Amino acid sequence: MKKKVLVGMSGGVDSSVAAYLLKEQGYEVIGVTMQIWQDDEEFIEKEGGCCSLSAVADARRVANKIGIPFYVMNFKDAFKRNVIDYFVDEYMEGRTPNPCITCNKFIKFSSFLDKAMAMGIDYVATGHYAIIEKHNDRYIIKKSEDDKKDQTYALYNLTQFQLERTLMPCGQYKKSKIREIAKEIGLRVHNKKDSEEICFIPDNDHGRYIKNRFPNKVREGNFVDKQGNVLGRHKGIVYYTIGQRKGLGIAFGKPMYVVDINPFRNEVVLGDLEDLLNTELIAKDINYIPFDTLKEPMEVEAKIRYSQTPSKAIITPIEDGRVRVNFQEKQRAITKGQSVVFYKDDLLIGGGIIEK
């Protein structure tokens, strides 16, 4: 009997080709677009935006073309609770969250998988660029064939339970090949541009988004230097992130950067580039893929943002399941709330949330 797979389809080229590849591999494929947009939002239509109304139309068209059933499933409440509310709360606390990682953890590989299992479906699949393999009795994640498109950074939270039930067929291919396949089989989305913005903030202005939704929460305050001297006024801490230089709305005669955000005093601390360079961080909420726990220090390559090349580091387990990360070289703008992710060559070791 054919194994069934529920494919999350965003209307983009990757998830479209993922559905096609799985059908070709002999699975019984069902396409689903997750409805996550909120009723009170004017969901801005933007080419490349994932899970918008036009994305549903694109996904449905692809499903018809490759001959699979297609549904739209409602994940609005789970998305608001786990992704949007968390996103807003983190910014209000002076941290910079990564909503795509949160969505993967709570929606795509949790709520979506729960729905699949309740329907008696064996697997879920996405268009992510990553390779899932089984080694001995454990599932592991390796970097995809296409290093530029590799998405393992956003997948470090996956559990063994989830990995056993997840398929990522695009990981074996380069992006150019995925577009080629889409063109060969006549998919209109073969040249659709990739979405790069946060799906629920298409203009990427997170400060404006939070201010519009919660006008009473966002208050003006002071820019200060490291000694606490007032340098000027800011429009609300949610508009700023560590390392930011542009958009401060104030001129200093020399480049000044956001080096800290103090939510208790509603202050944004400015400093020099040198103040942004550090070799150490503490991370919490750690998840490991090839093993359950880290018992002793380990040499890894680590990265503190999605687009970065990993740098040599040593990770050391400390109290409460947290980890100290010591980099060989100084890292610029280590940012609370972002994720630090660990690798050994092309093997994803795990990761966690930067605490300090």
UniProtKB/Swiss-Prot annotation:
It holds the Pfam family tRNA_Me_trans. One of its GO terms (molecular function) is tRNA-uridine 2-sulfurtransferase activity. Keywords: ATP-binding, Cytoplasm, Disulfide bond, Nucleotide-binding, RNA-binding, Transferase, tRNA processing, tRNA-binding. The record marks H128, Q338 as: Interaction with tRNA. Its main location: cytoplasm. Its EC number is 2.8.1.13. Disulfide bonds join C103-C199. Catalyzes the 2-thiolation of uridine at the wobble position (U34) of tRNA, leading to the formation of s(2)U34. HAMAP family: tRNA_thiouridyl_MnmA. ATP binds at G8, M9, S10, G11, G12, V13, D14, S15, M34, G127. The active site is at C103, C199. InterPro entries: MnmA-like, MnmA-like_C, MnmA-like_central, MnmA-like_central_sf, Rossmann-like_a/b/a_fold. It is found in: Cytoplasm. Belongs to the MnmA/TRMU family. GO terms for biological process: tRNA wobble position uridine thiolation. One of its GO terms (cellular component) is cytoplasm. The keyword ATP-binding applies. Transmembrane segments: none annotated. It is an enzyme of class 2 (transferase). It catalyses: S-sulfanyl-L-cysteinyl-[protein] + uridine(34) in tRNA + AH2 + ATP = 2-thiouridine(34) in tRNA + L-cysteinyl-[protein] + A + AMP + diphosphate + H(+). This is tRNA-specific 2-thiouridylase MnmA 1.
